[in-house]
Amino acid sequence: MEGAASDPYRRPARRTQWLLSALAHHYGLDRGVENEIVVLATGLDQYLQEVFHHLDSRGAGRLPRADFRALCAVLGLRFEGAAAPGEASEDTAAGDTNSGDVISGDAAAGEAAEWDEDAEEEARLALRAEPPELTFRQFHARLCGYFGTRAGPRLPRGALSEHIETQIRLRRPRRRRRRAARPPGPDGGPDGERLARLEEENSSLRELVEDLRAALQSSDARCLALQVGLWKSQAGAQEAARGEPEAAARELRQARGALAAAEAQAGRLRRGQAEVRRRAEEARAAVLRSLGRVRELEALARQMPGLQRGLRLLEGELRRYRSEGTQLPGPSRASPEPDTKSSEPEDGEARGPEPPPEGAWGSGNSPASRPPGPARASPGLDEQLFRSVEGQAASDEEDDREKWQEAQRLPAEVTALLAGLSGCGSGCDDQTAKKLMTYCSHLGGANHAHTLGELETCVAMLVEQLGSRGCGAKTLRTPEEEAELQRKVGENESLRQELQMVEAERVRLSLLEEKLEDVLGLLQRLRDLNISKKALGKILLSTLDACRDPAHDGPSGPLAVLEALHRALAGCELLRREPSAPASTAPALPHSFPISG
């Protein structure tokens, strides 16, 4: 029970505490002395039976443990060392927290005077663990045992209250007592009549009190049952109210976690989008640079005909400059074939008549194709004769070639001097130089070999004559003409190299244009197949990453990037699943880059 400072029994009992006050008054805790409490305490068993009956709305004769704890909460009963009723655990194995208090109270009550049999039964039932459902005896024992362990002197039990407190009677309609009419006493008179009248009034008052007690008990039991139901509903609402903030807080934490995850995902997507945009800008800038270079090369290619015409003019001017100087005609070579007619008599005189060639004999079996003679030559003799003729002809041809080469060998000094004479620009005797060159051109036979010394002597005389005239052998042109000629030759070479570079660049751009057309064709096909932007961007980014990878050992440059992009697009799953279409049905690309040759 609560402490003395907040003990409700120190004050006049409220109606919600009638049951507590009646129990306290019955067990000697005389703290409420109101008349209704005294009246209710005279029939405590019926009072508890009314309360149990109203709480047992099912009529099963058993009260659930939750309802009993709710009743204790309504009454304000709190056992020492135990939680509030309704908050205790549902596990019966944990034991009844009230048992320790009852045991201690039982030990304290053992020092009191003698207990009757009902008190011992109540204490014994109170020691048991609280079952899931309570019968009326358990309900009665637990409520009475709580006060019995703390009880003082019990109220005296008289004969007038024995019919109420001796046993627990079942609830049934009350029967009025009918007293038999008393015969007048022997000592009749005013005193006897007055005594009889007082006894009758006492009996009537006792019955009235009993009726009032029954009505009060029934009314209070009904009120307690309603309060228990209200407390249970409020406890459920409070439990739900306590659980709702926790559930709301849990949902709020989950929502915040989901929001943080979504924000992180959005941040990653924004960073990825920025990276894709940056790489797309880089690719766009690279394509624009390539396009600008292509246009520059197109402009250079359009200038190529003019460059070719200028190159042809320069070549013609170079030839004209070269032909301005007087050049002697080169020595005409004599025929490498020796004069067979002139050599035939000498050879014939030395060797005699030659046998006819192999073709003259024929290879047939007819008599006309056979060689003349009295006897027919054998095949082995014909072959031997053919080989001897062929060897002799080869040796003669080799001798003639050696003679011709010796005749053609002029001294190097003579050739150099003649070339110097032909390029002299200071008024030398051109006719003499031409005659010498013509003379040298006719030196081809063996009979002219003895004139080489005379030719050298003549050339030396001409050189001395030229030296006396002030014309050196190596004075071909003036320094200004030589410088101009060298400048023209350098310009010609630079133009030729530039032309080669332009041609190589044109070929490279042609390859680049073809690869661009292939890539644009694949992109058009993928767009017709409704490829997603995410997949297309992923292909582009993976291609750029592969080309920018330092471990990439392949070629670099726009053509390599386009080649890698073409392979990546060609390996797309959509194109593999697409049925192969004929090449004639491929759409024409509007964005081609023509390069004029």
From Swiss-Prot:
GO terms for biological process: positive regulation of transcription by RNA polymerase II. It comes from Bos taurus. Residues 336-352 have a biased composition (Basic and acidic residues). Residues 359-368 have a biased composition (Low complexity). Residues 85-122, 160-195, 322-380 are annotated as: Disordered. Residues 169-181 have a biased composition (Basic residues). Residues 43-78 form the EF-hand domain. Disulfide bonds: none annotated. One of its GO terms (molecular function) is calcium ion binding. Residues 479-532 form a coiled coil. This is EF-hand and coiled-coil domain-containing protein 1. InterPro entries: CCD48, EF_hand_dom. The gene is EFCC1. Pfam families: CCD48 (PF15799). Keywords: Coiled coil.
